[in-house]
Curated annotation (Swiss-Prot):
Species: Methanococcoides burtonii (strain DSM 6242 / NBRC 107633 / OCM 468 / ACE-M)
GO biological-process terms attached to the record: translation
Name of the featured protein: Large ribosomal subunit protein eL21
InterPro entries: Ribosomal_eL21, Ribosomal_eL21_arc, Ribosomal_eL21_CS, Ribosomal_eL21_sf, Translation_prot_SH3-like_sf
UniProt KW keywords: Ribonucleoprotein, Ribosomal protein
Annotated GO MF terms: structural constituent of ribosome
Similarity field: Belongs to the eukaryotic ribosomal protein eL21 family.
Example of a GO cellular component annotation carried by this entry: ribonucleoprotein complex
PANTHER family per the UniProt record, alphabetical: 60S RIBOSOMAL PROTEIN L21
Length: 97
């Protein structure tokens, strides 16, 4: 059988929650706000499919450039190039200094 090339292919362990994290995520993750220029970590929540960035950006850190509706526009470094990623707040964590 040929290999699939879907959006969630090769994410068997990347998009898996631990036993304690199973179920819906808290509402506080959905209503968190980020300022423009703030640094955030991409931490994909597999229980929320909308606004999910590509799995290759899991664990990356980026800078908030602005908003696109309810989602945030991020600038992430991928190798030597800078990429723009659109993601909902459920998939983001603020960076602690």
């Amino acid at each position: 059988m040929p290999t699939s090339h879907g959006e969630r292919s090769c994410t068997r362990y990347k998009l898996k929650k631990t036993v304690r994290e199973r179920g819906l995520s808290p509402i506080s993750k959905a209503i968190q706000d980020f300022e423009e220029g703030q640094m955030v970590h991409i931490d994909i929540d597999p229980s929320v499919q909308k606004g999910m960035p590509n799995a290759k950006f899991q664990g990356k850190t980026g800078k908030v450039l602005g908003k696109r509706g309810r989602a945030y526009l991020l600038q992430v470094t991928d190798g030597n190039s800078k990429k723009e990623v659109i993601s909902l707040s459920q998939h983001l964590k603020p960076q602690k200094y």
